[in-house]
């Protein structure tokens, strides 16, 4: 698996986690929903970091 494929898979997994947390949140009590909101925000940050790294990998690949 190439670094680019690894990063793409990681991004996909983060997106799936967001979907899962969003589904759970619909049935959660208030405190748990707040925790799930926090986890969703963390997953979004992870996606940003992974996308930034993916851009770098692609730029280096072009050289």
Curated annotation (Swiss-Prot):
Disulfide bonds: none annotated. Coiled coil: none annotated. It comes from the Archaea. GO terms for molecular function: metal ion binding; oxidoreductase activity. This is Uncharacterized protein AF_2240. It comes from Archaeoglobus fulgidus (strain ATCC 49558 / DSM 4304 / JCM 9628 / NBRC 100126 / VC-16).
């Amino acid at each position: 698996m190439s670094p680019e494929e690894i990063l793409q898979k990681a991004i996909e997994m983060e997106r799936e986690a967001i979907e899962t947390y969003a589904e759970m949140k619909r049935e959660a009590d208030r405190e748990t929903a707040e925790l799930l909101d926090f986890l969703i925000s963390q997953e979004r940050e992870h996606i940003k970091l992974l996308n930034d790294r993916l851009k770098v990998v692609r730029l280096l690949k072009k050289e």
